[in-house]
From Swiss-Prot:
GO terms for cellular component: lipid droplet. Belongs to the terpene cyclase/mutase family. GO terms for biological process: tricyclic triterpenoid biosynthetic process; triterpenoid biosynthetic process. It catalyses: arabidiol = (S)-2,3-epoxysqualene + H2O. GO terms for molecular function: arabidiol synthase activity; lyase activity. This is Arabidiol synthase. Keywords: Lyase, Repeat. Its EC number is 4.2.1.124. Converts oxidosqualene to arabidiol. Minor production of arabidiol 20,21-epoxide.
Length: 766
């Protein structure tokens, strides 16, 4: 039976190292002797229910660890369920009861170290690069045991589309990229090309989809790179990724420092592998794949003609003639000049050494977690190519388990975890609901959560001359996952700072030892560092690149990948934190904080769409963006009465509320750049919770409360018997095209909305 282990309990290794005793680390382990017959039956039922209903909802409810935690804590829901019949007659007691039920359930899910574990997967291209890397290096069976492979195959079966392909993410129609690499993944873990199973001939259907759509030469660049290192594609059919790029000076329009942090991290490993033209040693399976993936004989393919191919199903960012001409020029210079004698000895070898120096620096600085599962695979493979027995590679191997997550739908690979983000957003609604009569359960939850925040803050900048190594300050920030990962993010920092400021106001006998005030100041320094001239704030690093550089993006299936950008959600979160900070510490960098807030408000107001919404970047999409925008404006003192953008935002939500009283936004909004409801205008619990929060913050309860009551009725009536809420559509996103699953959102935004709603009822009802 699978068990989730937390922190130092998650196992140790001589090649692991940590900054805070592994606080926030979460590792799945298989124990053949664990689990009673009843527990095992419950797990199988959860798996069966997902498989039977996967055509209805594509994402798992993340039940396995929740079942484990609830059993271990002896959870029992004793508070009776509330059912609302007439929205206009909701009583304070009804809303409060629903909130208490949800809190009782949710607090039982907190880990001992103070964070809330959760799945953070969804993209269908996270698994295969790691599997391919481990296969090439000969460590597949060490990392992916028989039990791992059973769950991996289960996941692939569950998320294969009816046409035989896999989508970019679990809700997407099939694309070439994910179908090709997942087909390869299944073949590597032992599924035969014509294997018959309960789902039909999975590989047969996938191969048919690939061949019917032109073959694997139509996979985008990242897929071509995965295939090239495996030896089932030729490097000459890839757009160039020369390691000499890292020699470009900072005065050049594009250089290592101007790249978006994720593209830099991926390109760093790929440029080394490309520069070496590394290809795995052929195996019988590799030779079979060469014949299985293409409609023509492998030896007859003209790779030069495949370089710019990309299946129409994959194409989100089409290349222009100018872009194709640019990459052709880079290829000629890189391969016809730099890769030939004497330049291959004088320049190429020096570039490869520089690339590995950069790569090792980045890996050490983030404890070999890297920036995500895709760069992780390329970094790890590059280290193995450099030295198969080296310490760098062994340190990478020790961190692979940090990416593995087990759900009722099988084994998936995460980005690298959302521990901090999920935790700090959970603490927000708990802190918003703090009253004089806080019970022991809530107090204990808050204290543990505060302790987690204190231990998770990044307290140092990257080592040595970090600017030369394309790193920026990190001291004072909080990461998306855990401290060891080492990449602080602006919104994670802002939301954590706001929580710590609220804890700072509480008596020590309630919350224990408080955070050093200097660390609060460090967080403010980090946020101020990231604001751009336009008033917006970026996510990881200052926005140094020119927007026209996006025209030369080599990545076909996502948008905005070349340079760092400002984000409305991050800006809203930062305003919330800094307005609270200015109230408690009005003299610290007073003018800079005031200027940040003023410019940030203008940035948010300038970004508002014609319909009154804001386009979100990290969630689906216009409701999500509107929530963070309005939250920032309200924190800065704006109201429905003195702020036209807030009035327009409220009108947008009232206009899009469905007949049931809820909201449900489709991820297609992200692609169409226009609000798009779910098919049939059905309700989604996350969208409804977020919209309900905006209406309350916008003062709708004081003007016409019925739309708010109708939305609250939806949230209350959707609550399950145990206090949980139903898992529906995926509501996280990145790069405007890739869904990222946050199963905890169904709890966070439902309970946060109910918290604000009960407070509004208490104020208004006699």
């Amino acid at each position: 039976m699978w068990r989730l282990r937390i922190g130092a309990k998650a196992g140790n290794d001589t090649h692991l190292f940590t900054t805070n005793n592994y606080v926030g680390r979460q590792i799945w382990e298989f124990d053949a002797n664990a689990g009673s017959p009843q527990e095992l039956a419950e797990v199988e039922e959860a798996r069966r229910n997902f498989s039977n209903n996967r055509s209805h909802y594509k994402a798992s409810a993340d039940l396995l660890w929740r079942m484990q935690f609830l059993r271990e804590k002896g959870f029992e829901q004793k508070i009776p369920r509330v059912r609302v019949e007439d929205a206009a007659k909701i009583r304070y007691e009804d809303a409060k009861t629903a909130l208490k039920r949800g809190l009782h359930y949710f607090t039982a899910l907190q880990a001992d170290d103070g964070h809330w574990p959760a799945d953070n997967s969804g993209p269908n291209f996270f698994i295969a690069p790691l599997v391919i890397c481990l296969y090439i290096t000969g460590h597949l069976e060490k990392i992916f045991t028989v039990e791992h492979r059973i769950e991996l195959i289960r996941y692939m079966y569950n998320h294969q589309n009816e046409d035989g392909g896999w989508g970019l993410h679990v809700e997407s129609p099939s694309i070439m990229f994910c179908t090709v690499i997942n087909y390869i993944c299944l073949r590597i873990v032992g599924v035969e090309a014509g294997h018959d199973d309960d789902q039909g001939s999975t590989c047969t259907k996938a191969r048919k989809w690939i061949l019917d759509h032109g073959g694997a030469t139509y996979t985008p660049l990242i897929g071509k790179a995965c295939l090239s290192v495996l030896g089932v594609y030729d490097w000459s059919g890839c757009k160039p990724m020369p390691p000499e790029f890292w020699f470009l000076p900072s005065s050049f329009p594009i250089n290592g420092g101007t790249l978006w942090i994720y593209l830099r991290d991926i390109f760093m490993g790929l440029s080394y592998l490309y520069g070496k033209k590394f290809v795995a040693t052929p195996t019988p399976l590799i030779l079979q794949l060469q014949e299985e993936l293409y409609p023509e004989p492998y030896t007859k393919i003209n790779w030069r003609l495949t370089r710019n191919r990309c299946a129409k199903e994959d194409l989100c960012y089409p290349s222009s003639f100018l872009q194709d001409l640019f990459w052709k020029g880079v290829h000629i210079f890189s391969e016809s000049i730099l890769n030939r004698w004497p330049f291959n000895k004088l320049i190429r070898q020096a570039a490869l050494r520089t690339t590995m120096k950069l790569l090792h620096y980045q890996d050490e600085a983030n404890r070999y977690i890297t920036g995500g599962s895709v760069p992780k695979a390329f970094h790890m493979l590059a280290c193995w190519v450099e030295d198969p027995e080296g310490e760098y590679f062994k340190k990478h191997l020790a961190r692979v388990s940090d990416f593995i997550w087990i759900g009722e739908d099988g084994l998936k690979i995460q980005s690298f975890g959302s521990q901090l983000w999920d935790t700090v957003m959970s603490l927000h609604f708990l802190l918003d609901g703090v009253e004089d009569d806080v019970d022991d359960e809530i107090r204990s939850t808050l204290v543990k959560g505060y302790d987690y925040l204190k231990k998770s803050q990044v307290t140092e900048n990257p080592p040595s001359d970090h600017i030369k190594m394309f790193r920026h300050i990190s001291k004072g920030g909080w990461t998306f996952s855990d401290k060891d990962q080492g990449w602080p993010v602006s919104d994670c920092t802002a939301e954590s700072l706001k929580c710590c400021l609220l804890f700072e106001r509480m008596p020590s006998e309630f919350v224990g030892q408080k955070m050093d005030v200097e660390k609060l100041f460090d967080a403010v320094d980090f946020l101020l560092y990231l604001q751009s001239d336009n008033g917006g704030i970026t996510a990881w690093e200052p926005a140094d690149g020119k927007t026209w550089l996006e025209w030369f993006s080599p990545v076909e299936f996502v948008q905005d990948t070349v340079i760092e950008h400002e984000y409305v959600e991050c800006t809203g979160s930062a305003i919330v934190a800094l307005t609270q900070f200015s109230k408690q510490f009005p003299e610290f960098r007073k003018k800079e904080v005031e200027r940040f807030i003023t410019n940030g408000v203008k940035y948010i107001e300038d970004l508002q769409m014609k319909d009154g919404s804001w386009c979100g970047n990290w969630g689906v999409c216009f409701i999500y963006g509107t929530l963070f925008a309005v939250r920032g404006l309200v924190a800065a003192g704006k109201t429905f009465h003195n702020c036209e953008p807030i009035r327009r935002a409220v009108r947008f939500l009232l206009d899009t509320q469905n007949q049931e009283g809820g909201w449900g936004e489709s991820y297609l909004s992200c692609l169409r750049k226009k609000y798009t409801p779910l098919a049939g205008n059905k309700t989604n619990i996350v969208s409804t919770g977020q919209a309900l929060m905006v209406l309350i913050m916008g003062g709708q309860m004081e003007r016409d409360p019925l739309p708010v009551h109708r939305a609250a009725k939806v949230v209350i009536n959707l609550q399950l018997d145990n206090g949980d809420f139903p898992q529906q559509e995926v509501m996280g996103v990145f790069n405007m095209n890739v869904l990222l699953h946050y199963p905890t959102y169904r709890n966070i935004y439902s309970l946060w909305a109910l918290t604000l709603y009960t407070q509004a009822l208490r104020r208004l009802q006699p």
